[in-house]
């Protein structure tokens, strides 16, 4: 019996010594690197993930936390004219409405100020850079992030971040993996600065097709593998339908799939309408989600909310909600509350989402391995 007690005491003493050593190490780390340099994952003092709303209810719900995460990298990619820049501009508009400062790195030299203004962007306050080289673009982005004053920065697009050596070289010169190395170096530098400043960085990316793929999707994104690894959220956006008023096309039905999400369960899907000259229709998404969640009743073509008829036909109800933003806010708040998203996330103890069957259909091989990729 005595040997067993002795062993127990020895184990306890050893445990106390280890705890004292750990406490001393933590105190030294805190002294050298500041409070919060090391913390326990379950510590209640650990700040929750802050967000910047996308400006659309369906996208905020698909992201799982009510918007794009602050201090993280987000990649938005898809085919041409699918709505990538529109999504980013709406996020900028929301950040500005909340009193934040936004920056736009226009590497494609294609930003339309009039369109941005229609989406709600304060173009007078928006910081815009049209760099000559990829190095210049990423250096400007890094300096803005490290200032600590920027809430959101958009880089449009990764494919247009042309290395200086390629610009100064001759047509036909081979520059294998140059852009991939540039992105890898820049993201290594920016990741920590983004977290410390709470800045959201949205990288817009294009699709390419790999040559000779026999099985699976030949699609891949530009800029190598670094962005795929460093991004906390990756969104695949596609047009799925043209919206028409009679014979006239008035917009696109668009699907956004969250193919990677480090802050919430991934593979969620959002469908929304992008109206020409107007941007993403918030009201249309609110109507769809309110009906799906039983908040608004639909009987035939009539929509009813709390016993009061909203109108006949989705388009009329959409226009009615646009003229009554208070009602739109009320419906959106009830949707978030029922689904436990955004400020209601802490009150939701269990997942209410149906099992997700869709999976990413993009092959993520490094473009740096095959610079012979064919453009769309």
From Swiss-Prot:
UniProtKB keywords: ATP-binding, Cytoplasm, DNA damage, DNA recombination, DNA repair, DNA-binding, Nucleotide-binding, SOS response
Matching PROSITE patterns: RECA_1, RECA_2, RECA_3
Entries under InterPro entries matching the protein: AAA+_ATPase, DNA_recomb/repair_RecA, DNA_recomb/repair_RecA_CS, P-loop_NTPase, RecA-like_C, RecA-like_N, RecA_ATP-bd, RecA_C_sf
Biased composition (Acidic residues): 363-376
Main location: cytoplasm
SUPFAM superfamilies: P-loop containing nucleoside triphosphate hydrolases (SSF52540), RecA protein, C-terminal domain (SSF54752)
One of the record's GO molecular function terms: damaged DNA binding
Region feature Disordered, mapped onto this chain: 355-376
GO cellular component: cytosol
Swiss-Prot/TrEMBL GO biological process terms: DNA recombination; DNA repair; SOS response
Pfam families, alphabetized: RecA (PF00154), RecA_C (PF21096)
Compartments, as annotated in UniProt: Cytoplasm
SMART domains reported for this sequence: AAA (SM00382)
PANTHER family cross-referenced by the UniProt entry: MITOCHONDRIAL DNA REPAIR PROTEIN RECA HOMOLOG-RELATED, RECA
HAMAP family: RecA
UniProt record similarity statement: Belongs to the RecA family.
Biological role: Can catalyze the hydrolysis of ATP in the presence of single-stranded DNA, the ATP-dependent uptake of single-stranded DNA by duplex DNA, and the ATP-dependent hybridization of homologous single-stranded DNAs. It interacts with LexA causing its activation and leading to its autocatalytic cleavage.
Full protein name: Protein RecA
């Amino acid at each position: 019996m005595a040997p067993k007690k002795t062993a127990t005491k020895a184990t306890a003493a050893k445990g106390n010594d280890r705890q004292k050593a750990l406490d001393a190490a933590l105190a030294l780390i805190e002294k050298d690197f500041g409070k919060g340099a090391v913390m326990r994952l379950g510590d209640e003092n650990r700040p929750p993930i802050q967000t910047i709303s996308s400006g659309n209810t369906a996208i905020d719900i698909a992201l799982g936390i009510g918007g794009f995460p602050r201090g993280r990298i987000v990649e938005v990619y898809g085919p041409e004219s699918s709505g990538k820049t529109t999504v980013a501009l709406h996020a900028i508009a929301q950040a500005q409405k909340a009193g934040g400062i936004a920056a736009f790195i226009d590497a494609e030299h294609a930003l339309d100020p009039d369109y941005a203004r229609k989406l709600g962007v304060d173009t007078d306050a928006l910081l815009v850079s049209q760099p000559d080289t990829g190095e210049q673009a990423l250096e400007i982005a890094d300096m803005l992030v490290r200032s600590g004053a920027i809430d959101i920065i958009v880089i449009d697009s990764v494919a247009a971040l042309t290395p200086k050596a390629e610009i100064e070289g001759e047509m036909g010169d081979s520059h294998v993996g140059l852009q991939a190395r540039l992105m890898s170096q820049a993201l290594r530098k920016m990741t920590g600065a983004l977290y410390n400043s709470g800045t959201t960085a949205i990288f817009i990316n294009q699709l390419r097709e790999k040559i000779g793929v026999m099985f699976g999707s030949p699609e891949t994104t530009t800029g190598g593998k670094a962005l795929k690894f460093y991004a906390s959220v990756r969104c695949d956006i596609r047009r799925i339908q043209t919206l028409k008023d009679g014979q006239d096309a008035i917009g696109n039905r668009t699907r956004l799939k969250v193919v990677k999400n480090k802050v919430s369960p991934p593979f969620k899907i959002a469908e929304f309408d992008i109206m020409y000259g107007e941007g993403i229709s918030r009201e249309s998404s609110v109507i769809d989600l309110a009906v799906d969640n039983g908040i608004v009743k639909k009987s035939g073509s009539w929509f009813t909310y709390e016993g009061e008829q909203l109108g006949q036909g989705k388009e009329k109800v959409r226009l009615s909600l646009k003229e009554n933003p208070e009602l739109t806010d009320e419906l959106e708040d009830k949707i978030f509350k029922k689904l436990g998203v955004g400020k209601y996330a802490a009150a939701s103890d269990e997942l209410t989402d149906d099992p997700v069957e869709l999976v990413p259909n993009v092959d993520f091989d490094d473009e740096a391995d095959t610079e012979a990729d064919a453009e769309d």
